[in-house]
């Protein structure tokens, strides 16, 4: 049994598009590579064949993973997200208590939608886990691989 995942509509559509490309494009390309490698004869020492089979295995595993995620996904409507506490899909403005005048903003999302370059962090990350359920004014102390982080929650909102 799979864990339910929570996605935005955009996140769901991105995963669906990736699945479509894997099934209708990548899978066919890999089968063509396998057929081409087979045409070269002896498969026992055929690195091209082995590489194509490995790519096929990875492609099929990703297809199965995406099908599972999409079948268990719950699409969240940002308009229905409360901002009294930090929840998935809320954005938080944090004051770094270790660096003067540093304010950081994160949006908490599922692991599938996390993108630190865009300020989207997973609710399963150390920072995400520490923020869930907190309210404005709470001070949060987080242990991460690089040490300790200390923040104060300044604002909770939905983008």
From Swiss-Prot:
It comes from the Bacteria. GO terms for molecular function: DNA binding; RNA polymerase binding. The keyword Membrane does not apply. SUPFAM superfamilies: FKBP-like (SSF54534), GreA transcript cleavage protein, N-terminal domain (SSF46557). Transmembrane segments: none annotated. Keywords: Coiled coil, DNA-binding, Transcription, Transcription regulation. GO terms for biological process: DNA-templated transcription elongation; regulation of DNA-templated transcription elongation. Belongs to the GreA/GreB family. Necessary for efficient RNA polymerase transcription elongation past template-encoded arresting sites. The arresting sites in DNA have the property of trapping a certain fraction of elongating RNA polymerases that pass through, resulting in locked ternary complexes. Cleavage of the nascent transcript by cleavage factors such as GreA or GreB allows the resumption of elongation from the new 3'terminus. GreA releases sequences of 2 to 3 nucleotides. This is Transcription elongation factor GreA.
């Amino acid at each position: 049994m799979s864990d339910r995942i929570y996605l935005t509509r955009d996140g769901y559509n991105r995963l669906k598009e990736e699945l479509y490309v894997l099934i209708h494009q990548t899978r066919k390309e890999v089968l063509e590579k396998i057929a081409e490698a087979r045409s070269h004869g002896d498969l026992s020492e055929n690195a091209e064949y082995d590489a194509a089979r490995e790519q096929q295995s990875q492609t099929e595993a990703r297809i199965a993973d995406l099908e599972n995620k999409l079948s268990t996904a719950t699409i969240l409507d940002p308009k229905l997200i409360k901002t009294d506490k930090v929840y998935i899909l809320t954005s938080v403005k944090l004051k770094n208590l270790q660096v003067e005048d540093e304010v950081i903003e994160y949006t908490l999302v599922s692991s599938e939608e996390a993108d630190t370059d865009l300020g989207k962090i997973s609710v399963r990350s150390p920072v995400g886990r520490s923020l869930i359920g907190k309210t404005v004014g709470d001070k949060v102390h987080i242990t991460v691989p690089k040490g300790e982080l200390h923040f104060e929650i300044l604002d909770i909102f939905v983008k």
